[in-house]
Amino acid sequence: MTFGVLFDLDQTLVDTSSLKTLRDRRMWRNVPHSLHLTRVCDGAQELIEALQTEGMPLGIVTSAPRMYAEQVIGYHGLNIEVLTAYHDTRAHKPAAAPVLHGMKALNASSGVYIGDAEIDRAAAIAAGLHFLGVPPISPEPLSQMITRIRLLAGEEKS
């Protein structure tokens, strides 16, 4: 049984709050000119590297269009191969469909979804996954999640 880890993108892996106006207005073509205003969230790169070292498959599930997500991921050099974006499913978060799509792409039968919003929590629960929240919905930062993820993965194997 393979345990997968899925992340939300905006405000979970990358602080894209500086792009909010562009995102709200769907000005996707202007995003590349503003990527320098974004930053990887504290602990994100370290968590990704630790999970990859342990052989856990990783993916991103976002409500953003693929073009936008790929630009953000590429700019910051996040080494995550699986991406489920807005147009990959007909239903969107808080529905289970995008999370299930990500799990299928990871070839994982169980896992955890990590996000910053209630729709992330709802999507994880609807998909039958564990959920770990980052601020603002939970005080736990990414840098402190490795132990909890290991415990969840261990529970699924036993």
Could you say what each language-model-derived stretch is?
Residues 1-42:
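Active-site neighborhood of HAD-like aspartate-dependent phosphohydrolases
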Residues 57-58, 115:
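Short, conserved structural micro-motifs that define repeat-unit consensus positions
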Residues 62-64:
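Conserved phosphate-coupling serine/threonine residues in phosphotransfer and NTP-handling enzymes
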